[in-house]
Structures are given as structure tokens and as C-alpha cells.
């Protein structure tokens, strides 16, 4: 693909300079600063044809990347809004769009109680205010103009140096930062440190009955460590450590807000079993791999009180309402491992409790185009909670995909999957 880099770079520099200058002027006007995302972009910006402009992070265009997809225009989709790439922020835009398509987040931030919380003076330096305003602005009906998330980008850069400046980043890193930061801010102030206390409690009481430990952990969590983030994204798993000498087992419960599957290791395990046809692994194979025991060669058993051989594995105990799956490909040749997944996901064979409530449907996919997570280009495919159709978000460009097909969704490298319980919402 031939691109005039000089002209592309000139257009991008003009765009960024114009927009940054505009925001500097906007921020000096208190009345105009109240709504940080809903505004008319400068005339000079609107004159730039985004459909024909290469993107900052990778100089890749959606028409080239997805020319085989069955895509139609979104002229009738006035509830959709894109996000402008403001210097290698495709990683941020794709994550925000996936969050924005979770209707429970929108409902939470629109509630009077949350709006009051957002207006309190002592909360004005918190990330959840900018995040909530951005989510609400993305669903402004009858306004399909793209949003410019400069202030949100500036905020996360000030809070975490990893996201400072025009540097490409890994979407996974921003996802984990947002989840934990919002949970910490929206959790009750008196209970912020309870998570570490609970982990210490579970580690110190390994000899407790497994069921009793589960009940104790869940009760403490529900009473002391809840937020909208934990309600949506937190699940519970446990690590079983077993002595191969006396067969005693110790259990340690902990919360999780996403799962990471190392695709190269999953493929290697599949090869050892002789089940390899190509370099593709399925989500089922990822969950099966996650439950394989790993050896402990220098293990001290507190029951038989001696050094012995042991093994350990981690199992899912309670599933979250929205499960986030990160597909870690590694670098180099490992990056060529492919993933196969469906729109529906049944996890009843992999969870300890509430098996009847373990069915999920896909609502968002972050895909990556490049050879490592921190370079290349990120795009999001999201299912609209309004019309039920799928849309491709390539920064400011939105294109309709209509329905889920593997041909559409396995394009590029699917990297982060968002699944929602079918009985939830």
C-alpha cells in the first residue's frame, strides 16, 4: 500500500495543532469548560476528510484493512459517535468505545445519585468524572460528530506516566488501569484497603474448610469492597495447591477483573496432545489450559511438615457479569497464533458455582494490527445496546457491520474480548 507520508504527516500536524490550540482556549473559558466533550469542532478541523486521512499511530485506513468485510454506511445511526485520534491514541479510543457500549455503565453515570457524586468539590480531581462525562457524551442522540478526548487523555497521562505524551501504548495496559482506578475511586472511602486485608486473610487461613473460606471471602467482599466496577467486571477464582506426598490441598480465593490467556503456550500444549491442524486455538482450549496443574518442585507442605513435590492450578469459582478476556500473543513468531471464538460462550464446564448462569454473548472486541501490542493500530467492534447491530470503530470513523460473522471478527488479531451474561441486563 503506497502512502504519501509527507502529505499525511502535514495533515496530521495541522490537525493536532489546530485541535490542541482550540482546547487550550476552551479550557480558559470556565463556562465552555463545563461540558468537556460536546462541542462543535473548529471549522478547519471539519474541512479535513477523515475517510481519506491515514491515522497517526500506524498510517492504516479502515478501507484497506477491512476491504473484505460486508460493511454498510451508518447514515441512520445517529446514536453513534467516534473518537478522534489525537496522537497515537487508538489504543485509548478502542477501549473507551467498548466501555461505552456497556449500557449499565451509561445508566450508572446518568443516575441522579452519581451525578451528585460527580458534582462534589472533593471529587473534582477524580478520573471517574471525566470517564462518566465521556461515556454520556458518546450516547448523545442526534449528534454523530466525533468527540475529541484530549482532556481525558491529559488526565490519564497526569495520573500514570505510561500514558503521557504522543506515545503508542498497549490497550491492555489502559484497560487494567481504568478498571482499578475507577474501582478505587467509586468504592467506599473507608474500605479502599480492604482488598489487601482480605488477601492476607485468605493466605493466613489456608487450613480453613474450602466452603467456609469461600463464604467468608464472599461476605467480606460484598460488605466492604463493592463498586459499579466490581458489580460488572469482578469475578472470583481460587488457587489450589496440592501436596503430592500426603495429597492435602490448600485454597486461596482472590478476585479477578479480566482473564489473560497465553496463546503460544495454549498452542504448544495442543501440539503436545497431537491435536494441531494449524496455528489456531479456540477459547475452549484456552479455558482448558487455564486449569492444567503446574509443578511445584520445592514445596513445603504445612500438613506433613516436609519439603516435597507439589502442584497448583487456578480455577474459576464465580463468574462476573461481564467477563473480559485478553489474548496474549507475545512477540515475534508467537504473534502469529490465531484465535477462534464464537458470538456465544458457555462456561458451565469451567466454573465452580452458579453453573446455570454461565452463558455469555459477545458485546465488544478490540483488534490489533501490527506485530506487538504497543505498536500498530487498534480498532474496536462493538454491539450497540440500542439497535443490536455491530459497528466497527476506527477512531473517528464508524462503519456498520450488521451481524457477527467469523470472517468479520477474525480480521487482524482479536486482542481483547468483552462477553456479557445473557441473563444480565
Locate the predicted segments by residue:
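Papain-like cysteine protease catalytic cores
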Residues: 45, 54-72, 101, 105-255, ...
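Exposed substrate/partner-binding surface patches
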Residues: 14-78, 99, 112-122, 201-204, ...
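Long non-globular sequence segments
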Residues: 2-12, 237-240, 249
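Cys/His/Pro-rich metal-binding microdomains
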Residues: 84, 241-244, 299-302
